[in-house]
Every structure is written in structure tokens, then in C-alpha cells.
């Protein structure tokens, strides 16, 4: 392993100071509360910005010998946050960290002979298996100065405190709603994500003095965000093309605020007066339209883009293939916002989702005419060969894309074909394995396109036929060996309804007796 240089050491320490929460899952964020520096034998006031610059400077250019940092660790669950002190010692290439809590042990990091030297009273496993790998990674990482900082627009401590309060007030009841509605989606992900977004919006509105008279959440889905904001005293409404089971479980006020209605871009009108904020929370096809609709109404908006779409409702066409598809789409929506005349703010939320970048339009330029906005929209639709009449967003009936809508004769034909391919790949007729690519190459274009339009591809088809096929790792597909019912968990046992595939189609028949098999012989 290459020796760690002094510049790399201080780079790692600079990241550590601001990112201790990356080493401790119980900590939400680090907030620096005070910085002083040691200069010419005196202690002087300083700042987090000066500290960051000094850590990057060449040693010969530094004007101080070290810094003392006061910080606060924001706890994810505990009511009280934890205070700490960090000491940067440039002369001895040393960083020490102590905490005003018995629950976290202090430590020190030094540089000696090109290696990190780590010390603590007793927590040696944490030093070696958590801290050291992170320091090595941070010392070699390239810093992206343009990267959007998480929660950069809000007071992080206020946000964390409110988020904890919202979880205490709402999470248990919402979990019960989820069970009652028999929702198939992950309740913890959706509940905690929308509680985090609600906390963010409430703190943002308070800080920017832009609290809404009323808001409208377009494409509100399960209505969870609308419900929480309503419960916290913020008047607002949710629109979605399709009513969800959860809607009927919310309090009457929230139920009246959830509107089953298609948001058609060229004809949409709000049903209630006073709305001065639009919200797009993973609003899919509506995402590029949100700044346009807000611009037409001359109001603020908050957008958390997710799946990429054109204004026409078609799948998003890449503009810049040098970056990720998500970043490309985010840049496109940012451009749309500029064309709508907004002064744009960006932030990165801390939510259980990979799509965390938020776009906010809080102030619209008075000089931007609505005619310019409409011209831009028409040009975009023309460029991508979609006129007004062809704008097509989501259907009211959600399409099912899991192969259950494909003609049964097509499914059966594909299953038999793939089954025979694997069967013939080995003499014993049971242990054959074929790569997914080889199976796909053996199918015709018509066969592949027939299932791709409905379920996204052959993999879903094979998963749905789990009683016949199995995934063997390394992209290999095999024939599943039938297991006796006696070896199956009770929860997996069902009343026999279907004929045994192997009894009917395997040249050696089913290896199980009728009593042992899960299917009818």
C-alpha cells in the first residue's frame, strides 16, 4: 500500500471533521458550532471556512499552528445531542477528538512513517475496521467542489429535531394504516421518506418566510405527504389520477383534500383558491411539467424528480451521455425551470432513496413573459416530434407489467422452449444450466418483444415460473428440482390447484410421489 502523504492526511481529516456521522449510524449529522485558531501564541476567533482552507494549504503557507473545533453530533434517536471537541495540531500532524458523553469514546489520528496511527482507550476494533478504511478512502478521494451539499438550504439541527418529532407523532399510526390497506409497498421506506420531506418543507418554509397559504401536491400517490402536512397545520391538497386504498383511512379533512383527477398540462386548473406552492414528490411524468405549471400560475414550487420523462410523456431522451441518466434529467428539468423564469435553488435531501436531489423555484423573474414560457414548451414538443394533441401522461388504470397480461399461449410456448433448451444441455436431464444471454439468443425477436412490452423482459418471466426454473447465480438458469412438501415451511404450503409441470412434460416425470408433490399428479 502506498504511503500516505501529509496533504492526503489533512484531506482525510478535513472530511472526517464534517462527516463523523459516516462512522456512527446513530449520528445524523455534525454541526460545527465554534472554531478558534492558535496563531503567534494566541487564541483567535476563526471559522469553518478558514479551517477548511488551512487544511488544504501547503504547510509553508499556513499562518497558524492549529485549530480547536467545537461541534455538536445530532442524534438520530436520542432527545439530547452530543457535544464534542476536535483539536487540529499541524506541527505534530495530529487530530484529537473528544466527546462530552460516555456513550462515545474519544480517539486520535496521527501520521507516522506514511501511515495513519490511531489511538483510543479501548475501541480498537472500531479504529481498525471502521475508522482506518474510511480514512484511507478519504485520503485518496477526489473532492467534487460542485457537488450539492446535503440539507444545504435548511438549519440541520431544526430539521433533525422536527423529523424525530414527526416520527414519534405519526409513524405508528401510519404503519397501522399500511397494514389495514394491505399495501404491497415497503411501509418503512415510504413513511420515513415522506416524513423527512415534510420536515424539510416545514423548516424551509419557516426559514425563507415563504409558508404557503395552501399547497398542491401533483401526483400525490398514496397521499401520505399531504396528510402529514395537513396534520401539522399546513393547508393543502393532493391530486392523482387514481385513488389509493390508503386515502380512505386518513382523517376526513385529509380525505376531502385528496382529489382523484388527471393533471392534463394544457387544461389543468386548481380546484381551490390560495394555492401558492406546487409540490412534485417523485411525480414521474409530471416532473418536467411542474416548473411550467408553477410558472403559468406564478407561484413557488418544490420538485424531487424521479423517473425521467419528456414533456410529451415519452421516455426521456438523453442530452448528455457523459453523466448519469438521473443527472442528465435533473439538468434538463433545471433548464426548463430557467426557461420558466425561476431563480433556482438546489438541495440534496437525506431520505431512503437514490433520487435525492431537489429543485426549488421560490422567486420568478418579473421580466419573464408567459408567452416566452409557452413558446419554449411548444419548441420542446416540436423538437421531439410531439404536438399538443399527442401529450400523453399516465392512464387512470395502472398497467400491470409482470407477464400476467401476456397471452397464456405465448407464455406456455416460451416456457416449453426454454425448458427444452436447458433440458438438452445435460444428459441427466436435471442439472443443466444455461447463461441468460444464451437463452435470449435462442429466442426470436418477436418472442422477446412480446414479453418485453409487458414485463420488462425474460427475467421476470422466469421468476414468475419459479416452480420450473431457478436462478443459479452468475447469470445461470437451471431447472428446479421439485422438493417434497415435508421439507417446506408451513407458510409455503397451499391447497393443490395446478397440475405438476414435471409430471406432464419432463421425460423422466416428476421424481416425487403424488403425496409429496405440491402439485396435482
Curated annotation (Swiss-Prot):
Gene Ontology terms: cellular component: cytoplasm
Pfam families: AdoMet_MTase (PF07757)
Entry-linked InterPro entries: tRNA_uracil_MeTrfase
Keyword Methyltransferase: yes
Domain of life, per lineage: Eukaryota
Location relative to the cell: Cytoplasm
Gene Ontology biological process: tRNA methylation
Keyword terms, alphabetized: Cytoplasm, Methyltransferase, S-adenosyl-L-methionine, Transferase, tRNA processing
Molecular function per GO: tRNA (uridine) methyltransferase activity; tRNA(Ser) (uridine(44)-2'-O-)-methyltransferase activity
Catalysed reactions listed for this entry: uridine(44) in tRNA(Ser) + S-adenosyl-L-methionine = 2'-O-methyluridine(44) in tRNA(Ser) + S-adenosyl-L-homocysteine + H(+)
Known EC number: 2.1.1.211
Stated role: Probable adenosyl-L-methionine (AdoMet)-dependent tRNA (uracil-O(2)-)-methyltransferase.
Family stated for the protein in its record: Belongs to the TRM44 family.
Stated name of the protein: Probable tRNA (uracil-O(2)-)-methyltransferase
Organism: Drosophila melanogaster (Fruit fly)
